[in-house]
């Protein structure tokens, strides 16, 4: 079982998410912060995870502070260090004497390194961003990349909107993936060459990872629950017959609901199995009848 030493300066939400998920069976064995009263302390304690606080004394060098951190961590069993919003730039005193150390940065490095990544993204006009899990080196946000996860940027995004999307839709996916790979012994780090190799992270007909992007086609009624909002998304480049792009022939009738789309799509997929004319009846995604004939 891979054990993690987590370092955070604030909430440590990625660390706590990893503790809850235990990707690949990995567990968080210690959470250390450099800030008294950091919220991550409470979250870790609630999960039964040991915590330590090692603040930097006034006038203390970064190297001395990092040596005290390593001395504190020596009391715990861990295989890898994971940073999560740890607001200190680590020197060789830490990097050279700790196990492989990972960090998560809220952009698709090498784009938008450093502080205020979300503001940089919005100012640039970029329409795609995300996060990067990388190996920590002395150069900030420049270590070899382990994995990335992308999310869209919308025209009306504010900083908080983008921050939440990157955290919940990108970081909460990418960091557990990286930890799972480490736990499965699939990550090889060459510290001298500053490279990372991931065993089995291949493409081909059945790639290890997929990214799917669809566009909003229409907003929906849910059906029996009209107070619930819904929407249907589709691949606008699809040339095969499909329900989403089909015209509605019964003029004046209600637009299709969520349940209608599900049932109609099920019926269409069923009749596609036949070469001759076919009809299908679907109710709540369950086939209720199917028939073929020489003509409709």
Task: Please provide the spans of the model-predicted regions.
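Hydrophobic beta-strand scaffold residues
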Residues: 50-52, 80, 101, 128
């Amino acid at each position: 079982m891979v054990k993690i030493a987590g370092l955070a300066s604030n909430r440590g939400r990625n660390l706590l998410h990893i503790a809850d998920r235990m990707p690949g069976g990995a567990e968080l064995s210690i959470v250390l912060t450099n800030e008294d009263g950091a919220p991550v302390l409470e979250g870790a304690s609630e999960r039964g995870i040991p915590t330590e606080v090692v603040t930097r004394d006034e006038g203390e060098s970064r190297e001395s502070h990092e040596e005290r951190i390593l001395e504190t961590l020596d009391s715990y069993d861990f295989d890898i260090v994971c940073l999560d919003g740890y607001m200190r730039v680590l020197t060789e005193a830490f990097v050279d004497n700790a196990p492989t150390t990972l960090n998560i940065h809220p952009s698709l490095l090498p784009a938008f390194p450093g502080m205020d990544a979300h503001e940089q993204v919005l100012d640039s006009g970029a329409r795609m961003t995300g996060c990067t899990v990388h190996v920590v080196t002395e150069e900030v946000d420049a270590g070899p990349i382990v994995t990335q996860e992308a999310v869209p940027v919308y025209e009306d995004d504010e900083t908080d909107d983008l921050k939440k999307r990157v955290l919940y839709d990108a970081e909460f996916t990418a960091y557990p993936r990286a930890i799972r790979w480490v736990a499965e012994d699939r990550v090889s780090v060459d510290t001298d060459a500053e490279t990372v190799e991931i065993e089995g992270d291949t493409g081909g007909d059945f790639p290890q990872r997929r990214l799917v992007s669809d566009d909003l086609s229409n907003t929906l009624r849910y059906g029996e629950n009209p107070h619930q909002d819904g929407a249907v998304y589709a691949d606008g480049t699809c040339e095969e017959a499909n329900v989403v792009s089909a015209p509605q022939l019964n003029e004046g009738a209600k637009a299709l609901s969520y349940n209608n789309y599900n049932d109609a799509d099920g019926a269409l997929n069923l009749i596609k199995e036949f070469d001759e004319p076919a009809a299908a009846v679907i109710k709540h995604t369950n086939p209720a009848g199917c028939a073929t004939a020489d003509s409709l």
